[in-house]
């Protein structure tokens, strides 16, 4: 409903849908569906996506359990799923902190791996189309924050032309 707000409580691994007008919680996520998440996006009227850092304190010292994920929740079916997880696993996407995902209207997926200074762009079929590393002249990688794809027709033409030129 217009005016409702998604709130993401990272350290609780919890997302809620809050209605300020009535001061009520409309929905809250189930436990253990994601861990230390970021970036809730409305994908369709009945679906949201959540960037799952999948961060846990594991006995072997690892912090990210496998790879980061994009978790989808469907309000109509009350089901959770992942989006292009095999692609994220293949590219070893694993930022401990922060991170963003953006599912574009054509189904493509943009991922900001914030802590590793990497931005990835996947086709809707999971093919890695391009990667950007935020590398400075000293060859160090620097964090990325709040990257996004501007999805407008004129931008799509520019991106497609760029991708075609890179393929040659």
Predicted segments with their positions:
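Histidine-/acidic-rich catalytic cores in large beta-rich domains
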Residues: 1-168
């Amino acid at each position: 409903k217009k005016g409702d707000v998604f709130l993401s409580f990272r350290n609780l691994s919890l997302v809620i849908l809050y209605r300020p007008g009535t001061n009520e919680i409309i929905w809250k996520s189930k436990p253990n569906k994601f861990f230390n998440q970021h970036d809730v996006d409305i994908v369709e009227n009945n679906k949201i996506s959540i960037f799952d850092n999948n961060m846990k304190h594991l006995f072997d010292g690892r912090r990210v359990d496998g790879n980061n994920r994009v978790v989808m929740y469907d309000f109509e079916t009350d089901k959770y799923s992942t989006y292009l997880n095999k692609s994220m696993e293949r590219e070893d996407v694993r930022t401990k902190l922060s991170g963003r995902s953006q599912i574009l209207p054509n189904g493509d997926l943009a991922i900001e791996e914030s802590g590793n200074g990497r931005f990835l762009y996947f086709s809707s079929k999971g093919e890695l189309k391009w990667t950007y590393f935020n590398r400075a002249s000293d060859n160090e990688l620097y964090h990325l924050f709040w990257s996004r794809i501007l999805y407008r027709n004129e931008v799509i033409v520019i991106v497609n032309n760029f991708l075609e030129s890179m393929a040659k």
